[in-house]
C-alpha cells in the first residue's frame, strides 16, 4: 500500500485471510485499501470483521469512523471515535475528527470542547486554531472565528490557507478592505485555491473594478475549470458591463455544472431578456418558480417576457400571481425559502488532511521494495483507479481458447477437471485455457492456423473422429470462422464421449454467440446441455446469464449468476455482472455490494462504478 497499489494489496490480504481468517489485522488493512478506492460498503464490512476478531483496536474504530463520515452517518462516526479515544485518549487525529463530526451534527459546544482540549496541549498550533475558527463559522459566531483565525495567522504567517480563512470571514462581516488585503496576501503566498480569486473578484465587482474582477475570475476558471460558482460570478459581472453573449456562455456553463442550483436561472433570465430570447426566459422562470414559489421577481420577469411575445393573457396571469403573493408578504418573509441571486462567496479554504493517505501510511509500515509481481500491475492498478472512467458494460463470456491474456490479478478459479483431463489426454494440439479475452494473432500465427486446418482436414477425410473434428473447430474459431467451427462441433458431438461432449457443447455455445446472426435459442440449449451433463460447470451458468441479460431477462440472469457463484465463491466476473444487473433494475444496495466483492476479487474497474453509483 505504500506504493499506492491498492488493488494488488487487496489480493495479498485475501491470501492472508484465506490462510489465517482469525487475524484481525488483514481485515483492517484490506478495509484501508478499499477506503483508498472509495469502496466504503466493502471497507465497512471488513472493519466490522476486524472488530469482531479484536474489539480493542483503536485503529479499527478510527477507520470505521472515517467510513461512517463518508456515508454521512455522523452519529455512528462519533460513537466510533469515542471508542477509539477510550483506547487512545491522547490521539490528536481522533480528537480532531470527533470535533469535526460533532460540528457536522451541529453539536458546536461539544466540538469546541474537543478543540480546546487540544489547544491546552498545543496552544501554538495554527491547524487547531484554524479548526476552531471553522467550527465558529459553522455556528455563525464570526467574532470568535475571526479571533481564532488571527491566532492561526500569528503562528503560521506563510500558510495561504490561514489568510484565505481570514479573508472569507471579513468578507462575511462586510469588512471588504481587510478581506481584500488578506485575500491578496493568500494569493501572494502562492495560493492555488480558486476561491481566493473568486472572493477577491467579488470585492473588485463591488468596487466597480470590472477589469480586476474579470482578471480574478479568469484565473479562478484556470485553477478550477469545473466550478459552477466561478462561471456564475463571471457571468453576472459580464452582464453588468453589457457583454451579454459571453455572460450567457458563462451562465449556461454554470447551470450545466450545477443543474440543481435553480437560483442561477434568474440571472440567466435577465441576460436572455437582453438577447430577446423570450421563450427561454419563461422556461427558466418556470423552473425557478417551481423551486421557489414565493420568489416574486421570477413572476414579473416571466410576465415581461410574455408581453414581449405578444401573449398578454399569459403576462396577466404571471402578474396576477405575483400580486396575490404580495398580499402574503408577512408569510413569505417569515420562513419561506428565497433564492440567493447575488454573487456567490466561496467557502473558506479547507485545511483538512487527506486521512485516506494517513490510513495508507499506517498500513504500509515496514513494507519493503516492490516485488516483481507488484511492478507487473504498475500502470493499470496504482493510485486512485476509481477516478478512471469505465464503461458500464458486463464482463464478457468466459470461453476456451489456446490463447489468453494474463488474468492472474483476478481470483476466479479458471479451472475445471474435465478440461484439465482433456488437456492431459493430448487429444488436442495444445492445451485449452479459460479466458474472457483472447490474444490478437499476428499474421504469422494466422498462417500457422490455416496450415493446421489443412492438416486436420486431411486426417478427418481419412479417419473422422470427435477429437479431430473438435480440434479443427478450435482452429476455425481462432481465425474467427465461427460458422465452420459450429458445423464441426455439431459433427463431433455425436461421436464424443460424455466428458468431451460437455466441452464441445460449451465451446459451440460460445461460438454461436459470436456469429454474425447469433441464434440465442440454440446457444441456451447448448449451455443447458452442459449444465445437465455437468451441474458444477460454473462457466456455463455465467455465460447463460450473460445471454439472458441480452434478452433483458434480468431476474433469470441474476439467478444464473448466483448459481455460478455457488460453484465458485471467488467468481469475480459473476459478482461484477450480477452487481450491474441489480443496479439496472434499481436494487442499488445489492448491486454495490456485488461490485465491491468483484473489486476485492481483482476486477479493479468496479471501483469507478461504485464511485458513480453510490
Model-flagged regions — what are they?
Residues 19, 53, 87, 121-122, ...:
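Structural marker of alpha-solenoid helical repeat scaffolds
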Residues 29, 63, 97, 131, ...:
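Canonical tetratricopeptide repeat
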Residues 24-25, 58-59, 92-93, 126-127, ...:
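Helix-start (N-cap) detector for alpha-helical repeat units in TPR-like alpha-solenoids
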Residues 2, 36-37, 70, 104-105, ...:
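Register position in tetratricopeptide repeats
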Residues 273-274, 279, 283, 290-468, ...:
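Eukaryotic alpha-helical solenoid repeat scaffolds
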Amino acid at each position: 500500500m505504500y506504493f499506492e497499489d491498492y488493488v494488488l494489496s487487496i489480493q495479498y490480504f485475501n491470501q492472508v485471510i484465506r490462510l489465517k481468517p482469525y487475524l484481525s489485522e488483514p481485515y483492517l488493512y484490506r478495509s484501508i485499501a478499499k477506503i483508498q478506492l472509495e469502496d466504503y460498503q466493502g471497507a465497512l464490512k471488513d472493519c466490522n470483521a476486524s472488530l469482531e476478531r479484536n474489539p480493542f483496536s483503536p485503529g479499527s474504530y478510527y477507520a470505521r469512523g472515517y467510513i461512517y463520515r463518508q456515508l454521512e452517518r455522523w452519529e455512528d462516526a462519533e460513537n466510533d471515535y469515542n471508542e477509539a479515544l477510550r483506547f487512545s485518549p491522547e490521539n490528536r487525529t481522533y480528537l480532531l475528527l470527533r470535533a469535526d463530526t460533532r460540528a457536522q451534527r451541529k453539536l458546536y459546544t461539544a466540538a469546541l470542547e474537543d478543540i480546546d482540549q487540544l489547544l491546552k496541549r498545543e496552544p501554538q498550533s495554527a491547524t487547531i486554531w484554524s479548526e476552531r475558527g471553522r467550527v465558529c463559522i459553522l455556528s455563525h459566531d464570526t467574532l470568535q472565528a475571526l479571533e481564532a483565525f488571527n491566532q492561526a495567522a500569528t503562528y503560521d504567517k506563510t500558510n495561504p490557507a490561514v489568510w484565505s480563512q481570514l479573508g472569507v470571514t471579513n468578507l462575511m462581516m462586510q469588512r471588504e478592505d481587510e478581506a481584500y488585503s488578506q485575500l491578496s496576501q493568500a494569493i501572494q503566498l502562492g495560493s492555488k485555491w480558486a476561491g481566493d480569486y473568486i472572493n477577491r473578484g467579488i470585492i473588485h465587482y463591488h468596487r466597480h473594478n470590472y477589469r480586476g474582477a474579470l482578471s480574478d475570475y479568469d484565473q479562478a476558471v484556470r485553477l478550477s475549470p469545473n466550478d459552477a460558482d466561478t462561471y456564475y460570478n463571471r457571468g453576472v459581472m459580464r452582464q453588468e458591463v453589457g457583454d451579454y453573449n459571453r455572460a450567457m456562455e458563462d451562465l449556461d456553463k454554470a447551470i450545466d455544472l450545477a443543474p440543481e442550483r435553480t437560483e442561477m436561472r434568474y440571472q440567466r433570465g435577465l441576460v436572455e431578456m437582453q438577447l430577446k430570447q423570450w421563450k427561454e426566459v419563461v422556461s427558466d422562470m418556470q423552473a425557478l418558480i417551481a423551486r421557489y414559489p414565493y420568489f416574486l421577481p421570477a413572476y414579473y420577469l416571466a410576465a415581461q417576457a410574455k408581453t414581449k411575445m405578444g401573449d398578454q393573457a399569459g403576462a396577466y396571469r404571471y402578474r396576477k400571481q405575483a400580486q396575490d403573493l404580495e398580499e402574503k408578504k408577512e408569510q413569505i418573509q417569515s420562513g419561506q425559502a428565497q433564492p440567493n441571486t447575488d454573487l456567490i462567496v466561496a467557502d473558506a479554504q479547507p485545511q483538512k488532511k487527506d486521512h485516506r493517505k494517513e490510513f495508507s501510511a499506517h498500513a504500509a509500515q515496514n513494507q519493503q521494495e516492490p516485488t516483481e509481481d507488484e511492478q507487473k500491475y504498475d500502470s493499470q492498478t496504482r493510485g486512485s483507479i476509481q477516478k478512471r472512467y469505465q464503461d458500464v458494460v458486463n464482463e464478457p463470456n468466459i470461453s476456451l481458447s489456446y490463447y489468453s491474456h494474463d488474468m492472474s490479478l483476478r481470483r476466479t478459479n479458471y479451472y475445471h477437471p474435465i478440461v484439465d483431463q482433456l488437456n492431459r489426454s493430448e487429444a488436442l494440439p495444445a492445451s485449452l485455457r479459460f479466458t474472457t479475452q483472447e490474444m490478437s494473432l499476428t499474421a504469422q500465427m494466422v498462417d500457422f492456423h490455416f496450415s493446421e486446418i489443412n492438416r486436420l482436414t486431411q486426417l478427418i477425410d481419412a479417419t473422422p473422429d470427435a477429437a479431430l473434428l473438435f480440434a479443427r473447430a478450435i482452429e476455425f474459431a481462432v481465425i474467427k470462422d465461427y460458422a465452420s467451427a459450429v458445423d464441426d462441433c455439431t459433427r463431433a458431438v455425436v461421436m464424443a464421449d460424455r466428458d468431451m461432449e460437455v466441452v464441445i457443447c460449451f465451446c459451440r455455445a460460445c461460438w454461436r454467440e459470436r456469429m454474425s446472426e447469433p441464434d440465442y435459442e440454440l446457444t441456451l440449449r447448448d449451455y443447458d446441455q452442459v449444465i445437465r451433463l455437468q451441474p458444477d460447470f460454473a462457466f456455463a451458468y455465467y455465460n447463460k446469464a450473460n445471454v439472458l441479460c441480452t434478452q433483458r431477462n434480468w431476474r433469470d440472469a441474476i439467478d444464473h449468476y448466483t448459481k455460478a457463484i455457488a460453484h465458485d465463491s471467488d467468481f469475480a466476473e459473476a459478482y461484477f455482472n450480477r452487481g450491474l444487473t441489480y443496479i439496472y433494475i434499481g436494487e442499488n444496495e445489492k448491486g454495490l455490494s456485488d461490485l465491491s466483492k468483484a473489486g476485492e476479487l481483482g476486477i479493479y474497474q468496479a471501483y469507478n462504478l461504485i464511485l458513480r453509483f453510490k
